């Protein structure tokens, strides 16, 4: 794992491996985090919330510079594999650590498994696009979440025997935790009611660096809805909004929430505005209207058959879709194929050579 969101996808995998081992299967796993055990993005309750073990090892590579981080992971993960040999290295998503660890494994003659393979933005200026393409090209097992990802891989000449449509593993985590969610303490203090607030998440620096665009987006939100707006934001985002004078009596800015508390806010929202692909997927699973501040979706199924709409960075489009939401005319979504909570089981069965 290379970042906090990766753990939402490794948690069900660790449980599936534990279950397979308990059933007598010859399988063990070692969880590696490329960052530090003092990483402030990993809240103290994260691993308890996800019901998963803490990483077995932290590589302590925290550089923000791409090349230094890449080099640090290459060296540290090579040392890890020398000390703890593996038959398969499974990497998640499309981050710099994903690519770096797959390169190390391949150079050492170890099989690479890519979880959430085949996602494409078709924009080579996006670092994630390069990371994903390189990782997919090195992988022996390509675990996909949807048929669009399968098609992307097919179009690049990937051997179909290596592609395994296992479903969306994030849904495994969502299904597992639906009865474990925790109402944030601030929920009652703010006087919020379920299905009567708009949830807003914002993280991407590319948008935060565009002052005029950001102000126009918030203007559209505040003009087009009279509901409370709940926004769990990192300090750098909060400071940016403050510097731009973006404020309202209906805008409730919270600190980043623990996993189960944030899940509660997502589950009970009237609508969601986000720049997170994971949140958009969760919204489709829950049938909640979602407006994504991006021009592409990692899983296009959230748009074609789910509840997600891409608005890019256009305040005009956002205003239009908020009108649709206000009128109660949002599209009724459906669950994409294999969003059934069994992706992790399929992955383990495939690695054991048992999946049909």
Located regions from the model:
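Glycine-rich phosphate-binding loop signature in dinucleotide/nucleotide-binding domains
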Residues: 80-87, 192-193, 268, 354
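A nucleotide-sugar donor-handling region in carbohydrate enzymes
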Residues: 37, 41, 60, 135-210, ...
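Short acidic-hydrophobic, aromatic-tinged amphipathic segments that line or gate anion-handling sites
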Residues: 57-60, 144, 253-256, 309-314
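A donor-sugar binding/catalytic signature common to diverse glycosyltransferases
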Residues: 91-92, 103, 114-115, 142, ...
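Donor-nucleotide binding loops and adjacent catalytic segments primarily
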Residues: 44-47, 182-268
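Leloir-type glycosyltransferase catalytic cores
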Residues: 145-148, 176, 309-356
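Conserved nucleotide-sugar phosphate-binding/catalytic loop shared by glycosyltransferases and other
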Residues: 25-69
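Active-site and donor-binding regions of nucleotide-sugar-utilizing enzymes
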Residues: 1, 7-18, 22-23, 46, ...
């Amino acid at each position: 794992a290379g970042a906090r969101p990766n753990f939402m996808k490794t948690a069900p995998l660790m449980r599936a491996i534990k279950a397979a081992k308990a059933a007598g299967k010859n399988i063990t796993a070692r969880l590696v985090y490329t960052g530090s055990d003092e990483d402030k993005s990993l809240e103290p309750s994260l691993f308890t919330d996800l019901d998963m073990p803490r990483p077995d090892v932290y590589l302590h590579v925290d550089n923000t510079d791409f090349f230094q981080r890449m080099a640090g992971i290459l060296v540290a993960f090579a040392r890890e594999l020398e000390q703890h040999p593996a038959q398969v290295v499974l990497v998640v998503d499309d981050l710099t650590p994903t690519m770096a660890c797959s390169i190390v494994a391949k150079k050492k003659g170890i099989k690479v498994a890519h979880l959430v393979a085949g996602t494409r933005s078709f924009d080579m200026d996006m670092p994630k696009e390069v990371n994903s393409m390189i990782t997919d090209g090195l992988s022996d097992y390509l675990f996909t979440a949807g048929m669009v990802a399968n098609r992307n891989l097919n179009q690049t000449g990937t051997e179909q025997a290596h592609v395994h449509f296992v479903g969306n593993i994030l849904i495994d985590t969502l299904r597992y935790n639906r009865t474990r969610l925790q109402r944030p303490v601030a929920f009652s203090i703010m006087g919020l009611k379920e299905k009567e607030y708009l949830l807003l998440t914002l993280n991407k620096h590319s948008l935060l660096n565009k002052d005029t665009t950001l102000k126009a987006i918030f203007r559209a939100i505040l003009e087009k809805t009279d509901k409370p707006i709940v926004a769990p934001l990192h300090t750098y985002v909060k400071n940016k909004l403050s510097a731009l004078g973006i404020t309202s009596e209906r805008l409730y800015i919270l600190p980043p929430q623990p996993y189960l508390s944030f899940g509660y806010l997502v589950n009970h929202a009237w609508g969601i505005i986000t720049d997170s692909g994971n949140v958009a997927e969760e919204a489709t699973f829950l049938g909640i209207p979602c407006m994504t501040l991006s021009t592409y979706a990692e899983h296009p199924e959230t748009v074609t058959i789910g509840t997600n709409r891409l608005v890019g960075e256009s305040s005009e489009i956002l205003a239009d879709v908020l009108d649709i939401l206000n009128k109660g005319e949002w599209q009724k979504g459906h669950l994409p194929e294999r969003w059934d909570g069994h992706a992790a089981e399929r992955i383990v069965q495939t690695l054991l050579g048992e999946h049909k």
